Every structure is written in structure tokens, then in C-alpha cells.
């Protein structure tokens, strides 16, 4: 088959959305029209719910992709837990998600190596592909449990994940171990630290990739668009959730570049987008997924993505754009970007560096946020409300291991010593 003669033009501005029977979906579609969104990744309980929703969206000129959880169960979780407890993912300690919890109760990931699991997923995808009018399939939770959570989530669970720990390191189902030993001649558990074994990590990534590409084959056989919502970059995702999505046969990708989960600075979006331009599958059109911000940061984030190679935006979710002023600005923004895309032959041309800068000290926004946090700590210790002025000395590196870089710096004004730790997954300052 020859190369495509023309690039398919996908909707440019998207939202993810949960759909439930009885909701006023028509009014949401009207709001999407009003602010310039033309694509929706819809999560509905059954194929019949999509059959009800699609005509409403199409009336408003909005394309609909079925937003489907794959390796993690959703609507059929309790049924499968009861009928097939042997299907569930196992961690390095030998604990199965069939009878243990990782972070939250709804994390019930399946083992991708099992033929029965693959067949179950394939039949599920087929059932949604048979929905007339559905434009595409967007897979989510297509991965293992997070061996490392984004840094801002650690306090919520009372944890520090400065390296890979056994309780959150999944992929040790007996069938996974059997297949790996068959291919490589050893059991990864025999090593002092299996997390350092690149072959074992890549093997788990490849199992997830095989299932993704099986899904893509089904989706394409129905003439529909194949999409996914993975972690921020292939390198980060491979480390954090075993999701090497640059190898997936996607038509369009919506990486979840949620800066508030990581550094809190829009430079995270710029860096990830630069890395994604480099590492995505050549056949895949790159978009950027981001959290909704009801203020100026929304537009700074979209600029960071579109100026560095993304071809469009997905917002989680439209409900986060609340103020009339932000909605007006969003509409003006979408109109202006579409004009630029049309003038450039259907693509957003961007000038961006070859690689992201992994030096945290060169990221002004990250350093500013960190110094504000230091000022808050000093003021609180002194019983004051006003932020304290800083006189920081030199940052001294005190430790470095895996993706972790540890520094100390002294504030001469308060004589406070701060421990500062940066995390770098892939080529991106991640937290």
C-alpha cells in the first residue's frame, strides 16, 4: 500500500466527556459549538448509548470517538472479577489485583499476555465499532498500574516514589513470567532489582503494544479512526506505566500532558510536545491533552502545545471552562488557530528545538514556583503571612539515582537549608 496522498484533517479542538442516559447532551454540544470545539471523546456505558448520542453530536457538526478503557476494567468490572479472577495483573510481591488494591479501588488492570484477555478486549472493541456513525475509537487506561505516580499526587497517598517499588510494580502474572523466560532464558524476579532490567521493562511495554496494535487492526477494518490517550511522552510512559506508545499504530494521539500533575509550569507542555514530535509513530497525528483552566493559563498551555508541534488540543474537560469571558476567549482562540491552519495547507507549522532541555535550572517557570514554595515555608515557620525575601546560595548536588536528582540550597536570610529533588523521566523535567 502506498503512502497517503493527503493528510486527513481531524477535528482540531476536543473534549473528553462522560455520557449517561438522560443527561442534556444537546446543550453540551451547543456549548461546544459556541466555543469552537468540534470533536468529543465520549465515555458511555453501552454501544446503545452511543447510538443515542451520535445523532445529537452530528447535528452540531461534532465528531464522536468512543472513549474506551481497555486494560483497566470499567463498566464490566464486577462481572469479570467474579468470573475471571485469574485474568488480573500481579505485582512484584505476587499480589493480584483480583484481591488487592493499588492506589484506588477501580484500578483493576488485566494481564495483556493472556490470549483470553486479548480476545475479550477484541470482542468489546468490535461491539463499539459496529455502532453506525461512530467516527473513531480512543483507548484509555491501556497500560499497567502506575509504578510511579505524577509527583503532585504523592501527598494524597502519603508516598514518595523516588524509584520503582515492588508494591506498585505490576506485570508479574505467571503467564508474563513464562513468556519472558521463554524468550530471554531467565526469571526477572531472580535479580536483586528487577526494575533496573531494561529487557524486562521493554517486554512489558511490548505486551501492551501488541494489544494496542491488535485493537488498531480491528478499528481500521471497520474504516474508523484509531486514537489513544496515553501518558505524556513515550519515554515517560514507558517508565511510569509501561506504555511505549510511539510504537502503536495510531491515526491520532492525545497524550495527557497535565502540567498540574507534574511541574505545574507550562514548560512541561512545551518539553513533552517537543519530545512527542520526535518519538511518535510517523503515521500518527500529534495532539495535546491538557486540563481545563478557567483563566489565562488555558491559553498559555495551548500556545505551548501548538507552538511546539501539536496539531490540535483536547481539554479535560469542557466543564472546567466556566466563565463567560474564558468561553469568549476560547472561541476567538479556536477561530484564529483554524485560520492559521488553513493558510498552512491544513497543518500547524511550528518552530521548536530538536530536544527538550532537561536542565531544571534553565526552566524559569519551574524555579519561580519552587522559590515561591520556599518563601511560604519560611513565612509559615516565622508565623507570618507575607512571603519572605530569599537570598539563595548555590545549589549543590548531593545524590543522583535512577530518574532522581537531589540538591541542597541554603537561604542566607533565614538560614534555612532546603532539600530540592527533581525527577526526570525520559528527557523531560517531570516533577
What function would you assign to each model-found segment?
Residues 255-266, 287-353:
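Substrate-binding cleft of secreted/luminal carbohydrate-active enzymes
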Residues 66, 70-127:
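Active-site-adjacent "subsite" loops/lids of carbohydrate-active enzymes
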Residues 22-46, 132:
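Catalytic domains of carbohydrate-active enzymes, especially glycoside hydrolases
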Residues 225-263:
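Substrate-binding cleft/loops of secretory-pathway carbohydrate-active enzymes
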Residues 2-26:
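Boundary/entry segment of secreted carbohydrate-active catalytic domains
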Residues 16, 37-44, 103-119, 197-207, ...:
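The substrate-binding groove and active-site-proximal loops of carbohydrate-active enzymes
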Residues 138, 201-239, 284-293:
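Aromatic-lined carbohydrate-recognition surfaces of secreted/lumenal glycan-active proteins
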Amino acid at each position: 500500500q502506498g503512502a497517503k496522498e493527503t493528510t486527513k484533517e481531524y477535528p482540531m479542538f476536543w473534549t473528553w466527556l462522560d455520557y449517561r442516559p438522560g443527561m442534556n447532551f444537546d446543550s453540551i454540544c451547543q456549548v461546544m459549538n459556541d466555543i469552537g470545539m468540534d470533536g468529543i471523546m465520549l465515555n458511555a456505558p453501552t454501544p446503545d448509548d452511543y447510538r443515542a448520542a451520535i445523532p445529537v453530536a452530528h447535528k452540531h457538526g461534532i465528531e464522536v470517538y468512543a472513549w474506551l478503557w481497555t486494560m483497566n476494567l470499567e463498566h464490566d468490572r464486577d462481572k469479570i472479577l467474579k468470573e475471571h479472577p485469574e485474568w488480573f495483573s500481579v505485582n512484584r510481591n505476587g499480589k493480584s489485583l483480583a484481591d488487592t488494591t493499588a492506589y484506588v479501588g477501580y484500578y483493576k488492570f488485566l494481564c495483556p499476555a493472556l490470549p483470553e484477555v486479548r480476545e475479550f478486549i477484541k470482542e468489546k472493541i468490535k461491539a463499539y465499532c459496529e455502532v453506525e456513525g461512530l467516527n473513531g475509537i480512543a483507548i484509555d487506561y491501556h497500560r499497567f498500574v502506575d509504578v510511579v505516580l505524577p509527583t503532585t499526587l504523592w501527598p494524597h497517598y502519603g508516598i514518595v516514589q523516588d524509584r520503582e517499588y515492588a508494591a506498585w510494580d505490576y506485570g508479574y502474572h505467571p503467564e508474563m513470567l513464562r513468556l519472558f523466560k521463554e524468550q530471554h532464558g531467565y526469571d526477572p524476579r531472580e535479580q536483586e532489582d528487577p526494575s533496573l532490567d531494561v529487557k524486562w521493562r521493554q517486554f512489558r511495554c511490548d505486551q501492551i503494544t501488541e494489544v494496542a496494535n491488535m485493537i488498531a487492526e480491528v478499528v481500521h477494518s471497520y474504516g474508523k479512526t484509531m486514537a489513544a490517550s496515553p501518558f505524556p511522552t513515550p519515554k515517560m510512559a514507558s517508565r511510569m506505566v509501561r506504555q511505549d506508545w510511539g510504537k502503536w499504530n495510531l491515526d491520532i494521539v492525545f497524550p495527557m500532558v497535565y502540567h498540574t500533575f507534574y511541574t505545574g509550569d507550562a514548560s512541561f507542555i512545551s518539553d513533552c510536545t517537543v519530545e512527542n514530535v520526535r518519538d511518535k509513530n510517523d503515521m500518527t497525528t500529534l495532539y495535546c491533552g491538557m486540563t481545563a483552566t478557567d483563566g489565562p493559563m488555558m491559553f498559555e498551555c495551548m500556545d505551548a502545545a501548538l507552538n511546539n508541534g501539536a496539531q490540535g488540543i483536547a481539554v479535560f474537560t469542557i466543564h472546567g471552562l466556566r466563565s463567560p469571558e474564558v468561553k469568549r476567549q476560547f472561541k476567538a482562540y479556536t477561530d484564529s488557530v483554524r485560520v492559521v491552519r488553513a493558510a498552512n495547507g491544513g497543518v500547524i507549522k511550528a518552530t521548536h528545538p530538536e530536544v527538550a532541555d532537561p536542565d531544571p535550572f534553565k526552566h524559569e517557570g519551574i524555579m519561580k514556583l519552587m522559590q515561591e514554595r520556599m518563601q511560604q515555608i519560611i513565612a509559615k515557620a516565622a508565623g507570618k503571612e507575607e512571603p519572605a525575601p530569599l537570598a539563595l546560595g548555590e545549589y549543590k548536588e548531593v545524590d543522583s539515582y535512577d530518574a532522581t536528582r537531589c540538591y541542597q540550597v541554603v537561604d542566607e536570610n533565614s538560614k534555612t537549608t532546603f532539600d530540592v529533588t527533581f525527577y526526570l523521566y525520559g528527557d523531560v523535567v517531570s516533577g
